[in-house]
Amino acid sequence: MRGTSEAERAAARDRVGDLVPLFTEVGDAKRVRVAHTPGSLAERAFRRSWAALCRGEAVESVARRESARAVAAARLGGLDVGTLLRAGLPKDEVVRVLRRSFDAVAEPVPESLRSRLREFLVPEPEEPEGSLPVPDFVQRLARQPRAGCTRPGRPRLVLEPPENHAEHCMTVAVYAVLLSEEFGAEPGRVFLAGLVHHLHNAGMPDSGFTGEAMLGDKLGAVMDRYREEALTELEASGGAELRRAAEREIREIETADGPTGRAFHAADVLDRVLQMHHYAREASFTVDQALEEMDLVHDGPVKSFHESVLARANLTPANDGYGR
């Protein structure tokens, strides 16, 4: 950051680093699903956000509500407002559950932002997700896989399962809100920047850095063509004002010179790298971790019986030949 001392830059690095464990959990919303509706939690939040914006809700309100829900979901997963209300929990108890989950992970978020987000954890009536009207590009981004890890001149490294663009955009939008105070940015603006930064991929398949390099000086024209297609859909669904706001944030994130650009680009690069950490963590996962670190056979009335069965089956870490 310009005009800051080394000590200030070090402190800023520490504050961003403090958020990484929370970001890792929030990012897992790309991989959590429920039975009653299709798509990951992140994909559903992307669809919900666009539906709210297109029906005229203020960007700031959508940004705060969806970011608060994403933080609470770090521990609650798919146990969201609608699920808890359908189970018969009173509204005040639903609020307590949501805030308990939020508080369990939100400590690294600056206190002033944390308190404002927490206020948005309220059980508002929700429309069935399948009935939410959204522009066509929202569905296409949900179907468009991310390219993964590519580099010109090298074979493509395909990582499975791929995240989709709706999941990535939603995660970046939430990260950017959580980083907004650090960079002096407005939460609503950085949230919208996250939602719109891959609009062109609604029509342009993601071939990564490798494919883009093959387009050479035609890359900009191709991206502009498909971005305009999505923006036209957005204007038809949400009006000219929403389109203008989207265009403003697209211009703003062409660089990292201003507060919006810095918060957005910090969120974007963190999500890209944390996604790679996810693949690495998944590939190195062991049964020992499940049993010992994650307490797979957890406390309860039948824990001792479970452990005795695993011992007889030679499936405990203490037994020789474990895992064979």
Model-derived segments and spans:
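Acidic catalytic motifs of isoprenoid enzymes
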Residues: 54-124, 197
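A short mid-domain helix/strand-loop element embedded in enzyme catalytic domains
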Residues: 137-158, 162-173
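Histidine- and acidic-residue-rich, metal-dependent catalytic cores
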Residues: 169, 173-176, 198, 227-256
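Histidine/acidic-rich helix-loop-helix segments that form or flank divalent-metal centers
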Residues: 8, 104-140, 191, 236-293, ...
